[in-house]
Amino acid sequence: MQNYREEKIDRVRELAMRVLQKVHAEGAYANVALAETLREMQLPERDRRFLTELVYGVVKAGDTLDYMVGRYVADIRKTQPAIRELLRLGFYQIFFMNKVPASAACNTAV
């Protein structure tokens, strides 16, 4: 069974995935979609910072992440939107975030 902290982190990653889906699939602006989510969820400051880093980081590194994922996925554009965002989030955490253990990023992406 997961402990309370792991459940909170997983919730933040889930929120990041939803915000990114709004950005990439629906054409929402990242800052607007993120602000709405932060306002609705009333997260603790640490979780707000983590969510913000995930969303802006994936958006900023988008082409690089798609290239990296594309080395393992035949055509990322044909991948289901939720799966595509999970892969981007996982790759971003593994390759761009120093403080997130690769095992944690991989575990939550799967």
Feature-to-residue mapping (PLM):
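Class I Rossmann-like S-adenosyl-L-methionine
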Residues: 1-110
